[in-house]
Amino acid sequence: MKFAVLKFPGSNCDRDMYNAALKSDVEAEYVDYRNTSLDGFDGVLIPGGFSFGDYLRSGAMASVAPITEAVKQFAKEGKPVLGVCNGFQILTEIGLLPGALLHNDSHLFVSRNESLRVVNHNTAFTNLYNEDETVVYPVAHGEGHYYCTQDMYDRLEANNQIILKYVNNPNGSFNDIAGIINEQGNVCGMMPHPERAIEPILGTDSGVKLFQAMVNSWREQNV
């Protein structure tokens, strides 16, 4: 398996994503935002940071970068896509995931470890966790408040698209939502950082299982 790690001007978690992929015993390669093809890749990782300085709003300018059309096609083909933090914001901006990310209720940047509850463990991203398992991922964002209408939330619930919820909501996200998937189950977005949770020496290795689940799920279908 080979992951594409996208790089935009202002990305700052691309190395963490790259290392998380390598730790899962697969290949990874950085892909510049000006590229227009994802040929040769089996998965896409969209890292956190402040793409294009977060001008207009987080992820807005990245959403019209050349690489995003390739990401849409990649997702349409059923291949796995993970967007974390700014990557989640980009996925909502390009319409691969529902909802939007707003400023934190506190209007402050939040940076700390957060406990999360695994709401749905029957996905390609969470199937190595137990249902209702508590995991710990770092968060680092100023615009992490996940917003959706009640109707959208009801659809997310009905389709089991909510995969992670905050134990102690740090940003005002609707019904504590921390991470979701698309209806097809191959696109995942979350504000917390699993790629920063892969080394026990840094306080938590809860994120290892998420990347390994992605790899295992791909291998089950393709090897």
Swiss-Prot record:
PROSITE patterns given in the database record: GATASE_TYPE_1 (PS51273)
Ranges where the Glutamine amidotransferase type-1 domain occurs: 2-223
Name of protein: Phosphoribosylformylglycinamidine synthase subunit PurQ
GO cellular component: cytoplasm
Gene3D superfamilies for the chain: 3.40.50.880
Organism: Staphylococcus saprophyticus subsp. saprophyticus (strain ATCC 15305 / DSM 20229 / NCIMB 8711 / NCTC 7292 / S-41)
Compartments reported by the entry: Cytoplasm
Alphabetical UniProt keywords: ATP-binding, Cytoplasm, Glutamine amidotransferase, Hydrolase, Ligase, Nucleotide-binding, Purine biosynthesis
Assembly and interaction partners: Part of the FGAM synthase complex composed of 1 PurL, 1 PurQ and 2 PurS subunits.
Matching Pfam families: GATase_5
SUPFAM superfamilies recorded: Class I glutamine amidotransferase-like
Enzyme Commission no: 6.3.5.3, 3.5.1.2
Major place of residence: cytoplasm
Pathway annotation from the record: Purine metabolism; IMP biosynthesis via de novo pathway; 5-amino-1-(5-phospho-D-ribosyl)imidazole from N(2)-formyl-N(1)-(5-phospho-D-ribosyl)glycinamide: step 1/2
Reaction(s) catalysed by this chain's protein: N(2)-formyl-N(1)-(5-phospho-beta-D-ribosyl)glycinamide + L-glutamine + ATP + H2O = 2-formamido-N(1)-(5-O-phospho-beta-D-ribosyl)acetamidine + L-glutamate + ADP + phosphate + H(+); L-glutamine + H2O = L-glutamate + NH4(+)
GO molecular function, one term: glutaminase activity
Role according to the record: Part of the phosphoribosylformylglycinamidine synthase complex involved in the purines biosynthetic pathway. Catalyzes the ATP-dependent conversion of formylglycinamide ribonucleotide (FGAR) and glutamine to yield formylglycinamidine ribonucleotide (FGAM) and glutamate. The FGAM synthase complex is composed of three subunits. PurQ produces an ammonia molecule by converting glutamine to glutamate. PurL transfers the ammonia molecule to FGAR to form FGAM in an ATP-dependent manner.
A single BP term in Gene Ontology: 'de novo' IMP biosynthetic process
Active site (record annotation): 85 (nucleophile), 193, 195
